[in-house]
């Protein structure tokens, strides 16, 4: 996005967004209609996350070429590792949903303009599409429209970050730093079952891309979720990027373009190592036929020839590639001698495992010699992770979870800038109602390195994990129908 070609494409992007905002809402390429594709069909917290968004980006890029008049347009990516802030062209231009008069200003106008055309679209859905909506929790139009109204943001609140405050928050800067990105690219399998030991590149296997999230990989749970929430805001009133109408903020496509680029980096790393780049043969029977039924072509017609997840495992007919960015360096060292993963270690969760603000739920892990050995190795040879599973309250909006590691018997410093901080996670899509246990994976290399440096990581001796809800981004505690429950912590290496 900062290169000369990126700047040229950014201007074409502005032209395309301008054109989409001017299209009538009866046109499927209208800016808001395009956002509804995401609301009605996007997967999060499962193994279809990467391929679905590749299809969504690919058709959007083709639409931008058509409407901008630039047949050579390529969607720029926002390399937030190199530039952990919203860059100036995203403010004070058509790419700024807060300050441009081209955007719908408030909920009343949104309903006046969009409800009727979306109802007409709903009435045109095929039985297969309606089945997908029912799986998603939209048995009728009223359920969809209720979620749409909840996911829209009035213009003054449409984006949390501003030209005066453009930087990603500190937790998000950690989530996008090069160490986290390298950790996200290190796994060598495409996807695992939710409860399986070890680590995969994608979020876990799920029964459908329409159901609630089952777990988050490092890539999805750290840079993806964190950037969404840092840009959109962690507390009410939420901005667009914090909701499932997030594509209404033009930052969305620059953000997701970088996620897709990192998937391409991982794929090329796997190829360099002679390893598989997709689901296993056994997994393909479930993965490949998953229906993607809501994409739109550049001419405004529904996509009818590529309606399966398997169609988007490769870049294929979209025919693009990426200029090098952060993370590219994992490919030359991909064949360096990495240590074999250690057997997964299970922490014992305390009987009282409610996660509250500054009141941690805890778990105790007895350190193995294998963990000490791999933690002492450089990151090029081994990385360590913690998979934290929680049973969340029905509404996860505004909940920012922090994880700390300390020696047994010590009181952890519950400060994200302190010596015991290991990592953090939060949900994206605050209007999702999460009821089942969800896992989040965080890299813990740095936390274990600090324990080693202090002589506090020893085989046979316990370490304590503490999980709390952060003060920042919290809701009023009285508004929580129930606290989150810590259910499991697994530690391993990759």
Curated annotation (Swiss-Prot):
Name listed for the protein in its UniProt record: Tyrosinase
A GO molecular function held by the record: metal ion binding
Organism this protein belongs to: Rhizobium meliloti (Ensifer meliloti)
EC category: oxidoreductase
Cofactor detail note: Binds 2 copper ions per subunit.
Enzyme Commission number, as recorded: 1.14.18.1
Cofactor: Cu(2+)
Residues binding Cu cation B: 224, 228, 256
Alphabetical GO biological process terms: melanin biosynthetic process
Reaction catalysed by this enzyme: 2 L-dopa + O2 = 2 L-dopaquinone + 2 H2O; L-tyrosine + O2 = L-dopaquinone + H2O
Family stated for the protein in its record: Belongs to the tyrosinase family.
Pfam families from the UniProt entry: Tyrosinase
Residues given in the record as Cu cation A binding sites: 38, 53, 64
This protein's UniProt keywords: Copper, Melanin biosynthesis, Metal-binding, Monooxygenase, Oxidoreductase, Plasmid
Superkingdom of source: Bacteria
């Amino acid at each position: 996005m900062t290169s000369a070609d990126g700047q040229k494409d950014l201007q074409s992007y502005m032209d395309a967004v301008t054109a989409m905002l001017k299209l009538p809402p009866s046109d499927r390429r209208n800016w808001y209609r395009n956002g509804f594709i995401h609301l009605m069909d996007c997967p999060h917290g499962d193994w279809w996350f990467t391929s679905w968004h590749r299809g969504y980006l690919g058709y959007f890029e083709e639409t931008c070429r058509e409407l901008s008049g630039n047949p050579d347009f390529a969607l720029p990516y926002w390399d937030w590792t190199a530039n952990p802030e919203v860059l100036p062209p995203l403010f004070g231009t058509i790419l700024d949903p807060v300050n441009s008069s081209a955007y719908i200003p408030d909920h009343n106008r949104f309903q006046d303009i969009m409800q009727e055309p979306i109802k007409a679209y709903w009435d045109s859905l095929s039985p297969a599409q309606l089945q997908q909506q029912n799986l998603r929790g939209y048995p009728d139009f009223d359920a969809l429209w209720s979620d749409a109204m909840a996911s829209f943001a009035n213009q003054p609140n449409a984006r949390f970050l501003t030209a005066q405050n453009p930087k990603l928050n500190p937790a998000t800067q950690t989530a996008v730093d090069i160490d986290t990105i390298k950790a996200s690219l290190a796994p060598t399998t495409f996807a695992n079952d939710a409860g399986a030991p070890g680590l995969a590149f994608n979020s876990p296997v799920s029964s459908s891309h329409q159901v609630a999230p089952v777990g988050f990989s490092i890539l999805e749970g750290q840079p993806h979720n964190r950037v969404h929430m840092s840009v959109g805001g962690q507390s009410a009133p939420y901005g667009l990027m914090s909701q499932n109408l997030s594509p209404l903020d033009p930052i969305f496509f620059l953000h997701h373009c970088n996620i897709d680029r990192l998937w391409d980096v991982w794929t090329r790393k796997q190829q360099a190592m002679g390893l598989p780049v997709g689901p296993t043969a056994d997994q393909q029977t479930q993965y490949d036929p998953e229906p993607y039924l809501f994409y739109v072509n550049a001419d405004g017609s529904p996509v009818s020839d590529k309606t399966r997840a398997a169609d988007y495992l490769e870049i294929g007919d979209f025919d693009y590639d990426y200029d090098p960015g952060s993370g590219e360096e994992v490919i030359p060292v991909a064949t360096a001698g990495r240590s074999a993963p250690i057997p997964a270690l299970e922490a014992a969760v305390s009987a009282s495992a409610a996660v509250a603000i500054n009141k941690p739920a805890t778990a105790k892990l007895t350190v193995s010699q294998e963990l000490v050995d791999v933690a002492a190795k450089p990151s090029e040879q081994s990385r360590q992770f913690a998979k934290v599973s929680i049973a969340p309250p029905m509404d996860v909006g505004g909940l920012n979870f922090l994880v700390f590691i300390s020696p047994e018997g010590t009181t952890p410093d519950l400060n994200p800038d302190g010596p015991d901080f290991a990592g953090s996670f939060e949900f994206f899509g605050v209007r999702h109602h999460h009821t089942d246990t969800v896992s989040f994976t965080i890299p813990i290399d740095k936390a274990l390195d600090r324990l080693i440096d202090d002589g506090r990581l020893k085989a046979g001796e316990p370490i304590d994990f503490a999980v709390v809800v952060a003060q920042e981004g919290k809701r009023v505690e009285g508004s929580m129908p129930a606290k989150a429950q810590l259910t499991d912590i697994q530690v391993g290496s990759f």
